[in-house]
Amino acid sequence: MNAATISSPHIELPALPYEQNALQPVISANTLGFHYGMHHKTYVDTLNNLIRGTPFADMPLEKIVKAASGSADHAAVFHNAAQAWNHAFYWRSLKPNGGGAPPAALKRLMDASFGSVDACKKELAKSAVEQFGSGWAWLVQDGEKLKIVKTADADTPMSQGSRPLLTIDVWEHAYYLDYQNRRADYVNALIDKLANWEFAAENLGRVNPS
């Protein structure tokens, strides 16, 4: 995944794929600045401190996530690596003037898996809104089918063997400055106006989405 690279041997904070104000009015520049420049950066910085001098230091980010998953001894490494990966994936799941109709290949799978594109969007929104506490809602590919899954805290569908296509961050820091406790408003606006269905379609059938 291009969301993170190794550099002597640290994991780098990826550049945002758009300007900080590009997602307004759904996500303000203020929220994006704090979310990316403080929260995401902290996960990357903490991870680099944790892996320095360990076998993880020579691994790409996705491999760290998979190697540390389920290990109590490496819980801190997993949490920070997964959050770094999840956030990089989240930024690419959004785009200015997004939403709308998905590409044909993705639409066919949405129709086959959920009955319609609208039904898929509704299930994704429901999952995101109903996730208890912090976490993520994901559109994933599982074999020939698409599914909606929720993960708590830092967890990722990669730990469950599914292929992520698109994600929504429902940690409060993703929306609280703009929406306070109105998570549903954030989720619905994101799906309607920012969802990057082209990115989701690009990830179909790929082992390492990018």
What residue ranges belong to the model's regions?
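Feature for soluble, non-membrane regions of globular proteins
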Residues: 1-210
